[in-house]
Amino acid sequence: TVTCGQVASALSPCIDYLQKDGAVPAGSCCXKXLSSA
């Protein structure tokens, strides 16, 4: 099972960008990764 934390760690560049841009919360980025896995 892949946890949200593991996905967040793998997508840290994506999450960092989204958080800086302020358009999408990190949770949303994580959720997209889990749904596409």
UniProtKB/Swiss-Prot annotation:
A GO molecular-function descriptor: lipid binding
Organism from which the protein derives: Vitis sp.
GO cellular component, one term: extracellular region
Family: Belongs to the plant LTP family.
Alphabetical UniProt keywords: Lipid-binding, Secreted, Transport
Transport as UniProt keyword: yes
Protein location: Secreted
Protein's UniProt name: Non-specific lipid-transfer protein P4
Keyword Nucleotidyltransferase among record annotations: no
Task of the protein: Plant non-specific lipid-transfer proteins transfer phospholipids as well as galactolipids across membranes. May play a role in wax or cutin deposition in the cell walls of expanding epidermal cells and certain secretory tissues.
